[in-house]
Amino acid sequence: MSEALNDLAAYVKEARGSLVVSADIAYGELTLNTTPENVIALLTFLRDDVQCGFVNIIDICGVDWPQREKRFDVVYHLLSPRQNLRVRIKLQVAEDEGVPSSTPVYMGAEWFEREAWDMYGIPFEGHKDLRRILTDYGFEGHPLRKDFPVTGFVEVRYDDVLKRVLYEPVELKQEFRNFDFLSPWEGTEYVLPGDEKAKQ
């Protein structure tokens, strides 16, 4: 498998090296790093080239790195059924930077891009229907961002008396607690009975 991935990485670099910033193989998958300006050209090449044949888009997701200047990674997962290979395309974008929509290349990318917009707030330029897909109407914020509060901003519940859904500010019934998960069986400073032989 890694030989096929090495061959694919070398082929893509040779054929379209200007579109690829770097290529790595980790955990049995090839990752091609690119830029927002080059992502559509790279996706089109990977789909249309006879040697590649990545005709299926499996997923598009985001990764939030709030400490970085380019806060988000946008990650595309592609599949080539003919070669039985997967490839990951990754690019970095700032919080206020858009990514060209990949829907002209892969029709199946539409809902994946809507999900990345809904969860992270990553805008996909040229997407024809970029609206929330998982959260409720009027939802504020993007819940998979690292700076989004764990409790959220509002609590949604159904009221049996009023026979409708109510949106109320979050009211915590107890303070946040900090649990100490250290095991009493790990990290001891003293030698346990029977272990003194192992140290010799």
From Swiss-Prot:
Locations listed in the record: Cell inner membrane
Keywords, ordered alphabetically: Cell inner membrane, Cell membrane, Membrane, NAD, Quinone, Translocase, Transport, Ubiquinone
Positions in coiled-coil regions: none
GO molecular function: NADH dehydrogenase (ubiquinone) activity; NADH:ubiquinone reductase (non-electrogenic) activity; quinone binding
EC number(s) from the headed UniProt entry: 7.1.1.-
Subunit: NDH-1 is composed of 14 different subunits. Subunits NuoB, C, D, E, F, and G constitute the peripheral sector of the complex.
PANTHER family: NADH DEHYDROGENASE [UBIQUINONE] IRON-SULFUR PROTEIN 3, MITOCHONDRIAL (PTHR10884:SF14), NADH DEHYDROGENASE UBIQUINONE IRON-SULFUR PROTEIN 3 (PTHR10884)
Protein name (Swiss-Prot/TrEMBL): NADH-quinone oxidoreductase subunit C
Lineage: Bacteria, Pseudomonadati, Pseudomonadota, Alphaproteobacteria, Hyphomicrobiales
